[in-house]
C-alpha cells in the first residue's frame, strides 16, 4: 500500500510539472526568466509555511512527520541535516530551473519536456558513482522510455539549438537534484526541506532578476495566472510531493516515473498552446 501511495504521488507530481511547462512558457513571455522563477519559488515557500504550522499542531510531540526515527537527543543533528538538505536542494533547483526557464523561451514546450526528461539516463549514470546499481530490466525500461518520449514529443525532426543546450544542462542539474533528495529525504521532514529549498532558490534567483531584469509591477499583470500556478502547484505542491514520494525509493525508478512530465507537457502544449 505504501509503494502504491508513493507511485500515486509521483504520478501526480509529473502531471503537475507537465502542465507547468505551459505556465512557464506563457509567464516567460510577460516577465524575465529570473523574475518568473524568483517569484514562483518565493510563493512556493510561503504556501508551505501554514502547512508546516498545521502539521506542527497535528503533531504536537515535535516529531517530524516525514523524518527518521532518531531520538530526541539528536534534534540538533536533525535540524542541521534539514538545513543542509534544504540549502543543497535549493542551489540545485535554482540552477536547474533557471537554465530550463531560459531554454524554454528558445524551444517548444514538447521539445523542452523531452530534453528535460533525459534525466532518466543521467540519474542512473551518476548513481553508479554513488554505488546505486540498476538491474538490466531497469536499463531496458530506460531505453524504451527514451524512445517513446522522443516519438511522442519530437514531431518535426530533432535539431540542436541554443535553447536545447540550456535545457540539456537543466536535465543534468535536475538529475543532481533527484540524487540530493534521495540522500536527504529519509532523514528529514520533507515539507520543511521543501520550504527551505524554495526560499534559498527564490533568494538566489532574485539577485540576477534585480540586477539584469529590473522587474516592474506592471509586467506581472499578464503573468500572475502562470506565476501562481507555477508557485502554488509546481513548487508548493509538486516539488514537496517529490520529496515525500521519493523517500526510500530507487532514484532511477523515481526518475522514470517523473519522466511522465514530458508526455504531459507535449499534450498540454498541443491543447493549450496549439504547439505540434
Task: Tell where the protein language model's regions lie, with residue ranges.
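Short, small-residue-biased leader/transition segments that mark boundaries at the very start
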Residues: 2-9
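Specific transmembrane alpha-helical segments of multi-pass solute transporters/efflux pumps
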Residues: 20-21, 55-116, 151, 231-249
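Hydrophobic transmembrane alpha-helices of multi-pass small-molecule transport proteins
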Residues: 48, 134-154, 174, 205, ...
Amino acid at each position: 500500500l505504501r509503494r502504491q501511495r508513493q507511485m500515486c504521488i509521483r504520478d501526480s507530481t509529473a502531471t503537475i510539472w507537465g502542465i507547468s511547462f505551459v505556465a512557464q512558457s506563457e509567464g516567460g513571455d510577460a516577465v524575465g526568466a529570473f523574475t518568473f522563477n524568483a517569484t514562483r519559488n518565493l510563493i512556493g515557500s510561503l504556501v508551505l509555511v501554514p502547512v508546516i504550522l498545521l502539521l506542527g499542531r497535528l503533531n504536537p510531540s515535535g516529531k517530524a512527520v516525514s523524518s527518521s526515527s532518531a531520538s530526541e537527543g539528536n534534534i540538533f543533528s536533525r535540524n542541521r541535516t534539514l538545513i543542509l538538505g534544504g540549502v543543497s536542494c535549493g542551489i540545485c533547483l535554482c540552477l536547474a530551473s533557471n537554465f530550463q526557464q531560459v531554454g524554454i523561451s528558445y524551444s517548444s514546450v514538447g521539445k523542452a519536456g523531452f530534453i528535460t526528461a533525459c534525466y532518466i539516463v543521467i540519474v542512473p549514470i551518476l548513481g553508479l558513482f554513488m554505488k546505486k546499481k540498476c538491474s538490466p530490466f531497469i536499463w531496458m525500461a530506460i531505453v524504451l522510455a527514451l524512445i517513446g518520449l522522443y516519438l511522442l514529443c519530437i514531431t518535426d525532426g530533432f535539431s540542436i539549438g541554443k535553447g536545447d543546450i540550456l535545457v540539456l544542462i537543466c536535465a543534468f542539474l535536475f538529475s543532481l537534484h533527484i540524487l540530493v533528495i534521495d540522500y536527504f529525504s529519509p532523514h528529514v521532514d520533507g515539507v520543511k526541506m521543501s520550504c527551505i529549498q524554495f526560499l534559498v532558490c527564490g533568494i538566489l534567483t532574485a539577485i540576477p532578476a534585480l540586477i539584469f531584469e529590473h522587474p516592474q509591477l506592471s509586467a506581472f499583470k499578464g503573468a500572475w495566472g502562470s506565476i501562481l500556478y507555477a508557485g502554488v502547484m509546481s513548487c508548493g505542491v509538486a516539488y514537496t510531493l517529490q520529496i515525500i514520494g521519493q523517500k526510500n525509493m530507487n532514484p532511477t525508478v523515481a526518475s522514470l516515473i517523473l519522466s511522465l512530465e514530458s508526455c504531459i507537457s507535449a499534450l498540454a502544449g498541443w491543447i493549450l498552446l496549439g504547439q505540434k
